[in-house]
Amino acid sequence: MAKDLKFSEDARQSMLRGVDKLANAVKVTIGPKGRNVVLDKEYTSPLITNDGVTIAKEIELEDPYENMGAKLVQEVANKTNEIAGDGTTTATVLAQAMIQEGLKNVTSGANPVGLRQGIDKAVEVAIEALHEISQNVDNKNEIAQVGSISAADEEIGKYISEAMEKVGNDGVITIEESSGFNTELEVVEGMQFDRGYQSPYMVTDSDKMVADLERPYILITDKKISSFQDILPLLEQVVQSNRPILIVADDVEGDALTNIVLNRMRGTFTAVAVKAPGFGDRRKAMLEDLAILTGAQVITDDLGLELKEATMDMLGTANKAEITKDNTTVVDGDGDQNSIDARVSQIKAQIEETDSEFDKEKLQERLAKLAGGVAVIKVGAASETELKERKLRIEDALNSTRAAVEEGIVAGGGTAFMNIYEKVAKIEAEGDIATGINIVLKALEAPVRQIAENAGLEGSIIVERLKNADIGVGFNAATNEWVNMLEAGIVDPTKVTRSSLQHAASVAAMFLTTEAVVANIPEESNNDAQAGMGGMPGMM
């Protein structure tokens, strides 16, 4: 494919147009009085949202050079979302401000490499200053405040706070769509996995089609159980205890399944068989998790164990097990707490080591099931369009809350950037490095300026007053009042604020040091070529 090239100022200006188009679409959403953006969807109703990363991902420009500029800012939003889960609009506003200011200086003759050094130096000092003014999140109310500010909805903040209180900071909180109008919180305690009973005849409640087992024994194996004789000696001992048994195996089939069902129907004993969760190595790990949680031993060839030789002390126990057609939940397992804590530490170490997002997600799910449980926020709304928009806001709020618990909080509404302004301004430097520091200083004003402008106010006036205000005091654009932002509950997670600044600076520095841009020249399609022939006579 042929290529087209642009150099120096021509290249940077072309890309800047793309940066501005994307950033201008995103930045109208920032702040309590930010607007929504409507996104066209090919097969469904339009999506109305104020989520920065969602808007950024949708933008594809026709001009290849403009599109490359837009893609750079998309990268800022994506990276910030990936690390902190929120703050994508702030990152976009910061990136645009740095690129615009930097380009003015490059056009005036500044050396881009010197500017980059200045930007890096300023950001390093800014991040140190952010951590100095950061405060830990200690209680339920502070967690609720973070969620409420991110989602612009107090009710959402309350749900997230309750969910984190019930399943812990490491717990899994999922967001699902509800079929009703109301949003509600549902907490699944204990370990749940997506495998249900192997026969509907195993249920204990035929109305609800659920098998509820009180104080069950739990047999865990990675083997396939085909012969009833293999488990008969163990079942005879379980019958004498007059307690139910949950069998978790690779599969239960043949006369083993038939006899379990027949004995269940005759009332001889209560047994429920479910397939083991996961596949391959993940299955082994999940079975081991369940064994540690319930105090069982996995019957496996790896340990040289046979089902015929299994004894009662190899079985796990729990306070309760609930099995539906699709899920099995084991509540309050009787495993040794020290063993559970050691397993939790092991999984946390694996999370730190892995680079795979998929593996990290699966490890976090396993961690949550061992550490506390799973909370589900079921999102309700009056229409599909509202449902999608509300779900996106809750996802952002949840990510913000987790970030706040991890690294603490700072004053919100762009105030934190102005609180660190003076420290960055005091950095001693000369020449292009000093100019690079000034680029960051100008960018630190941008979020506050944009929030004020979205509220219909003059941003410059708010910025100048903030430069002289005490740390933590800021402008509440929702009420047009000057308040202590932390006391008023207007806060941002430190991690979100830090990530947005770091990623914006990184992309801006790359942009300013760009000297050539190479774009593909689209190939003329066959249809266009044939149309150009004008239907020549004699053609067959």
Swiss-Prot record:
Pfam families: Cpn60_TCP1
Gene Ontology biological-process annotations: protein refolding
Reactions listed under catalytic activity: ATP + H2O + a folded polypeptide = ADP + phosphate + an unfolded polypeptide
Annotated signal peptide: none
GO cellular component terms attached to this protein's record: cytoplasm
Keywords on record: ATP-binding, Chaperone, Cytoplasm, Isomerase, Nucleotide-binding
PROSITE patterns (alphabetical): CHAPERONINS_CPN60 (PS00296)
EC number of the protein: 5.6.1.7
Keyword set includes Isomerase: yes
Subcellular location: Cytoplasm
Gene Ontology MF terms in the entry: ATP binding; ATP-dependent protein folding chaperone; isomerase activity; unfolded protein binding
Protein residues bound to ATP: T29, I30, G31, P32, D86, G87, T88, T89, T90, G413, N476, A477, A478, D492
InterPro entries reported in the protein's UniProt record: Chaperonin_Cpn60_CS (IPR018370), Cpn60/GroEL (IPR001844), Cpn60/GroEL/TCP-1 (IPR002423), GroEL-like_apical_dom_sf (IPR027409), GROEL-like_equatorial_sf (IPR027413), TCP-1-like_intermed_sf (IPR027410)
Record's subunit section: Forms a cylinder of 14 subunits composed of two heptameric rings stacked back-to-back. Interacts with the co-chaperonin GroES.
Similarity section: Belongs to the chaperonin (HSP60) family.
Function: Together with its co-chaperonin GroES, plays an essential role in assisting protein folding. The GroEL-GroES system forms a nano-cage that allows encapsulation of the non-native substrate proteins and provides a physical environment optimized to promote and accelerate protein folding.
Name listed for the protein in its UniProt record: Chaperonin GroEL
Source organism of this protein record: Staphylococcus saprophyticus subsp. saprophyticus (strain ATCC 15305 / DSM 20229 / NCIMB 8711 / NCTC 7292 / S-41)
Organismal lineage: Bacteria, Bacillati, Bacillota, Bacilli, Bacillales
